UniProtKB/Swiss-Prot annotation:
Localization annotation: Cytoplasm
UniProt family annotation: In the N-terminal section; belongs to the N-acetylglucosamine-1-phosphate uridyltransferase family. In the C-terminal section; belongs to the transferase hexapeptide repeat family.
Catalysis performed (reactions): alpha-D-glucosamine 1-phosphate + acetyl-CoA = N-acetyl-alpha-D-glucosamine 1-phosphate + CoA + H(+); N-acetyl-alpha-D-glucosamine 1-phosphate + UTP + H(+) = UDP-N-acetyl-alpha-D-glucosamine + diphosphate
Positions of UDP-N-acetyl-alpha-D-glucosamine binding: 23, 73, 78-79, 100-102, 139, 153, 168, 226, 331, 349, 364, 375
Record-given protein name: Bifunctional protein GlmU
EC number: 2.7.7.23, 2.3.1.157
Cofactor note (record): Binds 1 Mg(2+) ion per subunit.
Source organism phylogeny: Bacteria, Bacillati, Bacillota, Clostridia, Eubacteriales
Length: 453
């Protein structure tokens, strides 16, 4: 939409959150509230996004990308004052859409409808409204027929006006030229000395300007988040939206009540999510994979047909048709090629595991390069850290490591080689070689352990 801009108000302190973090930086479904609003605006192709910042400006600004323009509100003197700071930046902008950074449940289709009505009626202003069964504490929309009259705040409403269920959400479209003039006519008539943006509607009405409304069917879009309890309630709404979306896209979710998927996750059809699965960050799961139960993956990639059970993964790549778990721990830098098996109580860190290799149980593999068709026996440990530096272990294709092998890095095991159970290997092993390193077994005859009396 050319000649449009979005202005997102995010200057408030959020005192009720009782946090050192600015309110709009608290996360919902894995993303800051403000980012949800920015993403929504960009999905409807509004070319410019301005964020009005005040409290916590440095913290918020550090998270914004180059596409986002920052407008500074040095003193928080109300919503009208915030827009006054943004208007001088609206060069070659005919219309703006004003949103709140603490309303992350706004949807793209709602913004499209709001903009459409604004344009169709050549309105000076268009308000997004919602109908609440219990609108206590919210500003009411007064109309005569379908004609907007004004917004009445709860404290100023008559008993009859308080029965009105249609409320003001705080999201608006404005004609910039008309808004610029209207802002000159509002004054701070309250004890706080604040300029209220809603006062411009009275100015427009007095001038005979067109003011329209659009009532969203989803009341959750109107929810502003001002407390931890409200954040938790919004999290539940966002989670249900995400789960419903992926089920519509062909993902099987066995128990939605115990499944958590963040907004940045991507799933393909025929993925199955077992109970108590948590998918976070930029995790991607390919078709026919089965995740869970009791699995948490953060910024991981899972290939087609893989099974991941009772596992924690962070920044790991899992190839196709792998079997992971139960009780595996995949740390950052782990790359598993196709058909790899990682069994119970195995930890892998910063290592590449070749196709068809197996690490069945009770092992630690760190800073290692493992070839194809390698078998790593139970209890094998790569000793990669000397207290100062980390060192690399290389295990070539088709090597077989006996149980309880210790590999003291830097060390290389040649292709097709075997290590004897219980060996501590500190020197390179050539290809097709058996390496055994053991202490001599001793028998002490006629020895009887002293017993406690």
């Amino acid at each position: 939409m050319p000649h449009w801009a979005a202005v997102i108000m995010a200057a408030g302190k959020g005192t009720r959150m009782k946090s050192k973090l600015p309110k709009v930086m608290h996360t919902l479904a894995g993303k800051p509230m403000l980012q949800h609003v920015l993403d929504c605006v960009r999905s409807v192709e509004i070319p410019r996004s301005m964020v009005v910042l005040g409290h916590g400006r440095e913290q918020i600004e550090a998270t914004l990308d180059d596409r986002t323009e920052v407008v500074v509100q040095e003193e928080q003197c109300g919503t009208g004052h915030a827009i006054m700071q943004a208007i001088p930046h609206c060069h070659e902008v005919d219309h703006i859409i004003v949103l709140s950074g603490d309303q992350p449940l706004i949807r793209p289709e709602t913004l499209r409808n709001l903009v459409r009505i604004h344009i169709e009626h050549n309105a000076a202003a268009t308000l997004l409204t919602a109908c609440f069964e219990n609108p206590h504490g919210l500003g009411r929309i007064l109309k005569e027929g379908d004609q907007f009259l004004r917004v009445v705040e709860e404290k100023d409403a008559t008993p009859e006006e308080r029965l009105i269920q249609e409320i003001n959400t705080g999201t608006y479209c404005f004609n910039v030229a008309k808004l610029r003039e209207a802002l000159k006519n509002i004054t701070p008539k309250n004890a706080q000395g604040e300029y209220y943006l809603t006062d411009v509607f009275a100015v427009f009405h007095a001038q005979g300007e067109v003011i329209r409304t659009y009532c969203t069917e989803d009341v959750h879009e109107a929810l502003g988040i001002n407390s931890r309890a409200q954040l938790a309630a919004a999290e539940d709404v966002a989670r249900q939206r995400i789960l419903s979306y992926w089920m519509e896209e062909g993902v099987t979710i066995i128990d939605p009540r115990s499944t958590f998927i963040e907004a940045g996750v991507v799933l393909q059809p025929d993925v199955v999510l077992q109970p108590f699965t948590i998918l976070k960050g930029r995790t991607q799961v390919a078709e026919d994979a089965v995740i869970g139960p009791h699995t948490t993956l953060t910024d991981c990639t899972v290939g087609a047909g893989s099974e991941v059970s009772h596992t924690v993964g962070n920044q790991a790549v899992i190839g196709g048709h792998c079997t992971i778990g139960p009780y595996a721990y995949l740390r950052p830098g782990t790359v598993l090629q196709d058909k790899v098996k990682v069994g119970d109580f195995v930890e892998i860190k910063n290592s590449q595991i070749g196709e068809g290799s197996k690490i069945p149980h009770l092992s630690y593999v760190g800073d290692s390069q493992v070839g194809k068709s390698v078998n790593i026996g139970a209890g094998t440990i790569t000793c990669n850290y000397d207290g100062v530096n980390k060192y690399k272990t290389i295990i070539r294709d088709k090597a077989f490591l006996g149980s309880n092998t210790n590999l003291v890095a830097p060390v290389e095991i040649g292709e097709g080689s075997v290590t004897g159970a219980g060996s501590t290997i500190s020197k390179n092993v050539p290809a097709n070689t058996l390496a055994i390193e053991r202490s001599t077994q001793k028998h002490i005859e006629n020895w009887v352990r002293n017993k406690k009396k």
